[in-house]
Swiss-Prot record:
Enzyme class: transferase
Topology Lumenal: residue spans: 29-343
Residues annotated as glycosylated: N188, N282, N308
Cytoplasmic topological domain: 1-14
One term under GO cellular component: Golgi cisterna membrane
Pathways involved: Protein modification; protein glycosylation
GO molecular function: alpha-(1,2)-fucosyltransferase activity; galactoside 2-alpha-L-fucosyltransferase activity
UniProt KW Transmembrane keyword: yes
Role of this protein: Catalyzes the transfer of L-fucose, from a guanosine diphosphate-beta-L-fucose, to the terminal galactose on both O- and N-linked glycans chains of cell surface glycoproteins and glycolipids and the resulting epitope regulates several processes such as cell-cell interaction including host-microbe interaction, cell surface expression and cell proliferation. Preferentially fucosylates gangliosides GA1 and GM1 in the antrum, cecum and colon and in the female reproductive organs.
The protein's name in its UniProt record: Galactoside alpha-(1,2)-fucosyltransferase 2
Domain of life of the organism encoding this protein: Eukaryota
Reactions catalysed according to its record: a beta-D-galactosyl-(1->3)-N-acetyl-beta-D-glucosaminyl derivative + GDP-beta-L-fucose = an alpha-L-Fuc-(1->2)-beta-D-Gal-(1->3)-beta-D-GlcNAc derivative + GDP + H(+); a beta-D-galactosyl-(1->4)-N-acetyl-beta-D-glucosaminyl derivative + GDP-beta-L-fucose = an alpha-L-Fuc-(1->2)-beta-D-Gal-(1->4)-beta-D-GlcNAc derivative + GDP + H(+); a neolactoside nLc4Cer + GDP-beta-L-fucose = a neolactoside IV(2)-alpha-Fuc-nLc4Cer + GDP + H(+); a neolactoside nLc4Cer(d18:1(4E)) + GDP-beta-L-fucose = a neolactoside IV(2)-alpha-Fuc-nLc4Cer(d18:1(4E)) + GDP + H(+)
Length: 343
């Protein structure tokens, strides 16, 4: 049978167009409502598997981070403090991108990076830390906490020493470059029996310590005493000197024994080489500053540090506790404060 298909009538075409238009508008409104609802929800932070595993929790709420302030030594202290306090308080820890850019090229750190776009949407509770552990830090309130200050004290994280050492494990190529240099060193034609890393902090501290903090930096006498301490206890030691004031070191460190090597490049903007050299030694001589403290902490062995380098009324002692900075087993040699007493 032949069926003839007639065109829609004019009213029927309008009716179908009307239904289609209404349906489209309805679905678009539904979609927009869902999107708006998503934006109005509180920020949901995914808990990364690596973070949960590292912090010993299968499910953690909220997010903790820390300000990335200062150079390498400061940021190592901030990272380790965040790692320890977040774990202590049962919170997931995330580091700022700036901190990741400083530490990741040198160390095998594991804490995830905080996306800057996400960070800007989080209602942070800023929580200031002293440079030493306080009992109240075991119970810091808040799910979204940003730690502030310049924490760099073993009192925060020494109970997790093994984990901290793992976090600050050098990348293979960084470690191998340092070891290759050390393997080529000799003392009076023979291979050294002991490697002692020496870090001499100069730079801004030369002026800041006496003018601002009523303190001193290491002088020639201190370094001579520190080197002699190791010479008296170890056979054929070699002293690997790094500094941001290498010219001063060459003029003030006694090289007559043939056991001193000026090895570092002193470039503060790229400290990996100097730091790696120090940590691949057996022992440490440090002066002041977090760079030397961390080199000694990672190295282990014997450590000599500059002690009592401020006057008793120094404002520095209000923000810095020597007993919280230097491990009890380290050996301090008192600084010569006489230059301060002349003024």
């Amino acid at each position: 049978m032949l069926v003839v298909q007639m065109p829609f009538s004019f009213p029927m075409a309008h009716f179908i167009l009307f239904v289609f238009t209404v349906s489209t508008i309805f679905h678009v409104q539904q979609r927009l409502a869902k999107i708006q609802a998503m934006w109005e929800l509180p920020v949901q932070i995914p808990v990364l598997a690596s973070t949960s595993k590292a912090l010993g929790h299968s499910q953690l709420r909220g997010m903790w981070t820390i300000n990335a302030i200062g150079r390498l030594g400061n940021q190592m202290g901030e990272y380790a403090t965040l790692y320890a306090l977040a774990k202590m308080n049962g919170r997931p820890a995330f580091i700022p991108a700036q901190m990741h850019n400083t530490l990741a090229p040198i160390f095998r750190i594991t804490l995830p990076v905080l996306n800057s776009a996400m960070a800007s949407r989080i209602p942070w509770h800023n929580y200031h830390l002293n440079d030493w552990m306080e009992e109240e830090y075991r119970h810091i309130p808040g799910e979204y906490v940003r730690l502030t200050g310049y924490p760099c004290s073993w009192t925060f994280y020494h109970h997790l020493r093994h984990e901290i050492l793992q976090e600050f494990t050098l990348h293979d190529h960084v470690r191998e470059e340092a070891q290759k240099f050390l393997r080529g060193l000799q003392v009076n034609g023979s291979r050294p029996g002991t490697f002692v890393g020496v870090h001499v902090r100069r730079g801004d501290y030369v002026h800041v310590m006496p003018k601002v903090w009523k303190g001193v930096v290491a002088d020639r006498r201190y370094l001579q005493q520190a080197l002699d301490w190791f010479r008296a206890r170890y056979s054929s030691p070699i002293f690997v000197v790094t500094s941001n004031g290498m010219a001063w070191c060459r003029e003030n460190i006694d090289t007559s024994h043939g056991d001193v090597v000026f090895a570092g490049d002193g470039i503060e903007g790229s400290p990996a080489k100097d730091f790696a050299l120090l940590t691949q030694c057996n022992h440490t001589i440090m002066t002041i500053g977090t760079f030397g403290i961390w080199a000694a902490y990672l190295t282990g062995g014997d450590t000599i540090y500059l002690a009592n380098y401020t006057l008793p009324d120094s404002p520095f002692l209000k923000i810095f506790k020597p007993e919280a900075a230097f491990l009890p087993e380290w050996t301090g040699i008192a600084a010569d404060l006489s230059p301060l007493l002349k003024h």
